[in-house]
Amino acid sequence: PSAKGDDKFITTDYLQQCLCSRSFGERITDKDAMHQAVVQYAERAAEKLRGERQYCRQVTTFVRTSPFAVKEPCYSNAAVEKLPLPTQDSRDIIAAACRALNHVWREGYRYMKAGVMLADFTPSGIAQPGLFDEIQPRKNSEKLMKTLDELNQSGKGKVWFAGRGTAPEWQMKREMLSPAYTTRWTDLPVAQL
């Protein structure tokens, strides 16, 4: 196949990785606060994954301090959790992300960023389990996740997992957020005479 416009050109127009990461408004030094952040990022990554109609078999959690902080120790690490079955269930992805966090968390650092990345995708959740595997897919998982996404469709964060917390202090600062002129009526500029 050639890239000169003929219809046999092969493209990869499907998702290969899904990442949700943020820099924190306040540095995190507490593992519970980091756990809340990782749950929120895993939840959002799973939502994106379902939007692409994909299933994942790998969850990576990473944390890092600021490489530019003077007189502070620098630390960055990531851990990968392989899933026994492909999933798009937020519960499975959150659990894997939190297990990975336990591997990379180190006390004594002021973390400035964390994230969750999903990879090793398959377009369906069908997998051949081993003959003696005890792990089976969750019943009604797709229905539950579809309902969750429908409830959250009219606005992010209407329904969330408890591990995410209710009012995290570490959230991104949004004072300098650009106005959303094309998507939010309240941000439209008003002309006055």
Give residue ranges: language-model regions:
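DNA-contacting surface of Y-family translesion DNA polymerases
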Residues: 1-108
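Acidic, metal-coordinating catalytic segment for phosphate/diphosphate chemistry
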Residues: 75, 83-193
